[in-house]
Amino acid sequence: MKALNIEDPVVLCRATDHIAEQIAFIADLERKGFTYATGDGIYFDTSRQPDYGFLARLDKAGLQAGSRVDIGDKRQATDFALWKFSAPGEKRQMEWESPWGKGFPGWHIECSAMAEKYLGDWFDIHCGGEDHIPVHHTNEIAQTEARSGTHLANFWMHGYFLIANDAKMAKSSGDFLRVATLVDRGYDPLAFRYLCLTGHYRTQLNFTFEALDAAQTGLDRMRQGFHALSATPKASPDAALIERFTDQVNDDLNLPRALAVAWETLRGTLPAPTKRATLLRFDEVLGLGLADWRPQAVEAPGEVRALAEARAAARKARDFAEADRLRGALAELGWEMEDGAQGYTLKQR
């Protein structure tokens, strides 16, 4: 996470450390009349929730909600397990005592119990993957709202899958992207972050190394452009650009358009210190580490150094035609020469 410039979470909680909270949650649902028992567990009665399934926009009759038992043991196909009984005579690796007998929690109750403990009955934003919409989050909403009588979250934000070469990534197939793999191939991990910024979170992002190459190039150019900007202590961000950037972020987290505003700023005509201050403010959201980046020193080949010396001599002799020719020769080799009061500097393009 550090390599991708992702902040650490404030709380990392384990479901197995919160069994008591899950049992208390189920017991409260039972007291409110939202549960019933079958031969293999305690189930949530979705018929008690008239708007069950609204998040997924699905008909209750067509929604198969993570059932662990045959429909014959449940009142509705959408009903789901809150607590499962351990099989008689069998010892499970993970099982706990409860008011209903020895067993273990269902698939969804842990999230409601831990969210309630650390965030309260009602919070602003709930995130998850697109695959959580039809079952897991639908059931989480049902059980939490049944207990609390309030909405679980004001906003639901579901990230769509990262796919590779037009196929879903899967550990089982070995086609699973790791940061270490990118580093081993010579990529900056923040190039992957840049790539993610180019796609909206509610669209699937197709990962290819060609796309990562383009992202690395874009990141390098933004870093180099930022690094070339002069700074003054009193420079302030441009208020109009900050407003435009913020509007894009507030528009369903439209980071591709926010990134476009950053590029427009870098290429625009504002004074360099204002550009720099504005981009620094943007990077508090984009997280590309612009202020921390430093260009790596690259030793120019002998041929390049010789051309640079020849151009410096031609410029000193005021042979500008020859100086321009030599500058072009340097460019063909992928180098550029910047003149200054103390001489020249060479930069690889």
Q: What are these model-derived regions, one by one?
A:
Residues 2-15:
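Divalent metal-dependent hydrolysis catalytic cores, especially in the metallo-beta-lactamase
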Residues 6-9, 31, 253-256:
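Short, well-ordered coil/turn segments that N-cap beta-strands
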Residues 8, 19-230:
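Alpha-helical recognition segments enriched in aromatics with Gly/Pro capping
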Residues 9-10, 38, 324, 339:
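Short, hydrophobic secondary-structure boundary micro-motifs
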Residues 12-15, 101, 130-131, 300, ...:
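A generic secondary-structure micro-motif detector
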Residues 17, 106-110, 253, 257-260:
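Aromatic- and histidine-enriched alpha-helix N-cap/loop-to-helix transition segments
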Residues 167-171, 175-349:
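Structural preference for alpha-helix termini/caps and helix-kink/transition segments
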